[in-house]
């Protein structure tokens, strides 16, 4: 029962037995488990890799996400600032793009020269060497729409969708190239099996289906195709409601979509089963963080029962998990799938 092999079968829309189970993200949780601060991690590939591998040796997630917890660091490499805190991931301060008319001035070569990003690249190679036989290793970043919002500021981007759509499109083109450039060193090194992206600002809680179709999906599709041409599948998570855009996500070429816990799993499977693998969707806060082991087992079993035997399904939390989720609860999530 190799978790990686089970996941790969599900990703190809097969029906592995047992059902694979995975976290989404999990970086901040793994680092908290290791007692490591981001100031320490950012300068030490060994420490990053050790935290990720040690956590996964305890829980057996089918997928690991190198760079989870660091998704704002590319913005810092491109000119924004980060505010380090005692606990949790650093907060993004300011924007790398002050004016949409100056998007072309964004120097993407800074992604290649950034020490923190190099730390993650080296860590991925160490993780792949240590657990790559049993865990599907990915690099992770924001997807183009959210990446653009982090570069320019989400409130300003929302206004510009109406006031300056051409300027937004120019920003999105640049953000799409930045996302590709961010992941490229991992692909060239062969240190990952796939690419993961998160796109919280493309949620139905933030933008309409029409705006998603106009501003988010085309750039998601473009970068997904570039990764696919190199043989790397894309895994995606969007926070919140995505019921009205699941078909568009599948149309973008996404191989595996990890649902938020607020999305109806049964309805999602009705829409896209057979088109892309679905992960979902145990509540990460009310069940995994605040619930008991029994609560986790019951919620996991409910998801497994809903998914049934139709294939292309992975048991996952409905988002990244908080740093304070008890280890026993994560173990219960994975164990319930692997023992089912």
Features from the language model and the residues they span:
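Active-site loop segments of alpha/beta catalytic cores
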Residues: 1-30, 36-38, 51, 62-66, ...
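Short, structured active-site "lid" loops
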Residues: 40-50, 57-59
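Glycine-rich, N-terminal phosphate-binding loop and its surrounding beta-alpha-beta segment
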Residues: 52-82
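Short, basic/glycine-rich phosphate-binding loops at helix/coil junctions
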Residues: 96-106, 197-198
């Amino acid at each position: 029962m190799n978790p990686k092999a089970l996941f790969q079968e599900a990703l190809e829309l097969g029906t592995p037995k047992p059902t694979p189970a995975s976290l989404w993200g999990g970086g901040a949780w793994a680092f908290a488990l290791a007692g490591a601060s981001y100031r320490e991690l950012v300068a030490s590939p060994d420490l990053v890799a050790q935290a990720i591998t040690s956590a996964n040796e305890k829980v057996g997630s089918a997928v690991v996400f190198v760079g989870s917890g660091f998704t704002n660091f590319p913005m810092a490499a491109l000119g924004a600032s980060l505010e380090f805190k005692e606990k949790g991931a650093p907060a993004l301060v300011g924007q790398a793009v002050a004016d949409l008319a100056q998007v072309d001035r964004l120097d993407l070569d800074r992604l290649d020269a950034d020490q923190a990003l190099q730390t993650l690249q080296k860590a991925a190679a160490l993780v792949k060497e240590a657990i790559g036989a049993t865990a599907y290793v990915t690099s992770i970043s924001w997807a183009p729409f959210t990446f653009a919002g982090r570069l320019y500021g989400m409130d300003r981007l929302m206004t510009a969708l109406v006031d300056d759509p051409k300027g937004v499109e120019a920003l999105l083109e640049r953000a799409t190239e930045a996302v590709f450039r961010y992941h490229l060193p991992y692909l060239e090194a062969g240190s990952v099996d796939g690419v993961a992206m998160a796109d919280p600002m493309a949620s139905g809680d933030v933008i309409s289906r029409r705006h998603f179709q106009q501003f988010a999906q085309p750039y998601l599709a473009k970068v997904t195709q570039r990764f696919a041409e190199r043989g790397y599948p894309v895994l995606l998570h969007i926070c919140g409601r995505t019921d009205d855009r699941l078909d568009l996500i599948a149309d973008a070429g996404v191989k595996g979509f990890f649902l938020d816990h607020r999305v109806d799993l049964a309805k999602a499977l009705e829409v896209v089963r057979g088109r892309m693998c679905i992960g979902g969707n145990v509540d990460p806060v009310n069940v995994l963080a605040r619930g008991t082991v029994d609560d986790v087992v019951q919620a996991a079993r409910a998801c497994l029962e809903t998914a049934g035997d139709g294939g292309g399904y992975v048991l996952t939390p409905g988002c990244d998990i908080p740093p304070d989720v008890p280890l026993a609860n994560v173990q219960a999530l994975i164990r319930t799938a692997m023992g089912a």
